[in-house]
């Protein structure tokens, strides 16, 4: 399969997605060791995040799915582990469901990029001081990934806020929040 943007005009299969944002992460150990970039994606859930995931796993809506697809990022995968243990859903791990990419390191750059992203409605302006993944790139990455699951009608997707926001209007998405939507794949 060639990498690149999915042709959004060639979609056709409707899929019910039950989006779940991962539980609250604990970055303390990684920050103490000065991890940056994708190194921060190794953060496990905090104790609160584990409680959130345990509560989430009892949500009856999740049992209506046929499969759970999770981001490979630790906080999402740990959240997914609670759900699959309780529901018995088969689990697939997808590296393309990772968090939104900012091509600069540091929390300050991430926050600046997030503000620019929101201010520019997901576009990357030519004169942007920080490079980041656009809304169109994120949406395309998600659709490319989910095309593998077209045979399923209902899929739980454990992922990240910025990725979820490309498909749902929610301004704020809490840890372990569940949001249903229909997506054309």
Cite the ranges covered by each PLM segment.
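Acidic, low-complexity terminal tails and accessory targeting/binding regions
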Residues: 7-16, 59, 92, 96-115, ...
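Active-site-proximal alpha-helix that buttresses catalytic centers in soluble enzyme cores
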Residues: 16-92, 177-179
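Generic beta-sheet signal
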Residues: 17, 66, 153-161
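Short, active-site-adjacent cap segments at secondary-structure transitions
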Residues: 26, 76-77, 100-101, 163-165
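Phosphate-handling substructures
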Residues: 29-30, 34, 39-44, 85-141
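Short, well-ordered beta-to-alpha junction loops that form the rim of enzyme active sites
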Residues: 70-74, 96, 158-162
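A short, acidic, amphipathic alpha-helical segment used as a generic capping/interface helix at domain edges
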Residues: 138-150
């Amino acid at each position: 399969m060639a990498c690149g943007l999915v042709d959004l005009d060639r979609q056709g299969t409707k899929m019910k997605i039950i989006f779940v944002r991962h539980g609250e992460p604990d970055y303390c150990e990684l920050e103490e060791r000065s991890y940056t970039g994708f190194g921060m994606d190794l953060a496990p859930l905090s104790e609160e995040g584990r409680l959130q995931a345990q509560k989430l796993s009892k949500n009856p809506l999740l049992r209506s799915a046929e499969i759970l697809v999770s981001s490979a990022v630790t906080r999402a995968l740990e959240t997914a582990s609670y759900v699959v243990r309780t529901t018995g859903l088969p689990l697939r791990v997808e590296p393309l469901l990772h968090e939104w990419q900012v091509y600069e390191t540091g929390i300050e750059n991430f926050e600046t990029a997030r503000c620019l992203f929101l201010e520019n409605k997901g576009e990357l302006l030519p004169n942007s001081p920080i490079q980041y993944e656009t809304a169109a790139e994120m949406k395309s990455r998600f659709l490319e990934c989910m095309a593998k699951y077209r045979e399923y009608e209902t899929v739980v997707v454990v992922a990240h806020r910025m990725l979820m926001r490309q498909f749902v209007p929610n301004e704020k998405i809490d840890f372990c929040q569940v949001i249903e939507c229909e997506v054309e794949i």
